[in-house]
Amino acid sequence: MSLTYRDAGVDIDEGDRLVDLIKPHARPTLRPEVLGGIGGFGGLFALDVKKYREPVLVSGTDGVGTKLKVAFAADRHDTVGIDLVAMCVNDIAVVGAEPLFFLDYYATGKLSAEQGAQVVKGIAEGCRQAGCALIGGETAELPGFYERGEYDLAGFAVGCVDRPRIVDGTRVARGDVVIGIASSGLHSNGFSLARKALLERYPLDHRFDALGGRTLADALLEPTRIYAKDVLALLEQVPVRAFAHITGGGLPGNVPRTLPDGTRAVLEEQRWPRPAIFDLVEREGQVPRDEMYRTFNMGLGLVAVVAPGDEAAAHAALRARGLEAWTVGAIEAGGPGEATCEVVR
């Protein structure tokens, strides 16, 4: 009896069907600089170098982590792609880069074209929100590698910034103002802890008054906010000295990454409201507050550092973008040879 690749668990026809299903989602994301379409060996992007004095390419890669476990359990796959794009483009935007193009890696044990198309639909929506082109990706069917119905995602974003406009935190000084910009919820970090705290006690369809009657699935799968266009718009109006994308490690772990040695950011907890999902995780899981801050964004998905004289203009620019933001602290002198962030209660 002859043996085929399909017999071994890899269905090439299903992969081809997936490509056909995702093309209508990817096509609207394409920018004028993109040469060719989806399905080639490599994505082609003709960078318009005339827009820059000294163009610097900026790259970022990330995944969605165990938030995917919630998507599997809820059988919802059309928003985790937004999370994937957000985790990558937010990282490159905080140095001042405009996201240009994006690629994804989708790996699963048994390929379902319909499920994969839902994932890519979300990726395309994320690219639309970020203003970047989805120019390619890889679909890997790996029999026996994942549980049935499960998959993993990785994303890759490339952007560009003019060298004189790179935001690297070197101009941050004592007395500068720290502005926190609202997150949409947990974003894509801390889900192993959130799942342990909540999903061992409650089903995903459980509704909490504290969540405005939403189900746990709704709250946990709220897509990560994409800040790329907001960052670029703010930089057009205010000389922001530093940005931090608040991901794994929370405020204490991420704010210092953009500060010069010898400085510390002191943030006052009462200056911003905390979304109910964080209080729910803390209470139901009996998670210490310090652990919450080391794990989650605690309501601030992005932090900007500006000179005191630019504080009002920064808030006005953020309001104009429809973003909630608060002055949450200031930069003080710190210990020699290190940068730190402290949240004061």
From Swiss-Prot:
Pfam families in UniProt: AIRS (PF00586), AIRS_C (PF02769)
EC top class, as a word: ligase
Keyword Transferase: no
GO molecular function: ATP binding; phosphoribosylamine-glycine ligase activity; phosphoribosylformylglycinamidine cyclo-ligase activity
InterPro entries for this protein: PurM-like_C_dom, PurM-like_C_sf, PurM-like_N, PurM-like_N_sf, PurM_cligase
Gene Ontology CC entries for this record: cytosol
Xref: CDD domains: PurM
EC number: 6.3.3.1
Reactions this protein catalyses: 2-formamido-N(1)-(5-O-phospho-beta-D-ribosyl)acetamidine + ATP = 5-amino-1-(5-phospho-beta-D-ribosyl)imidazole + ADP + phosphate + H(+)
GO biological process, one term: 'de novo' IMP biosynthetic process
Pathway: Purine metabolism; IMP biosynthesis via de novo pathway; 5-amino-1-(5-phospho-D-ribosyl)imidazole from N(2)-formyl-N(1)-(5-phospho-D-ribosyl)glycinamide: step 2/2
PANTHER family, sorted: TRIFUNCTIONAL PURINE BIOSYNTHETIC PROTEIN ADENOSINE-3, TRIFUNCTIONAL PURINE BIOSYNTHETIC PROTEIN ADENOSINE-3-RELATED
NCBIfam families cross-referenced by the UniProt entry: purM
Entry's family note: Belongs to the AIR synthase family.
Listed name of the protein: Phosphoribosylformylglycinamidine cyclo-ligase
Organism field: Anaeromyxobacter dehalogenans (strain 2CP-1 / ATCC BAA-258)
Organism phylogeny: Bacteria, Pseudomonadati, Myxococcota, Myxococcia, Myxococcales
Gene responsible for this protein: purM
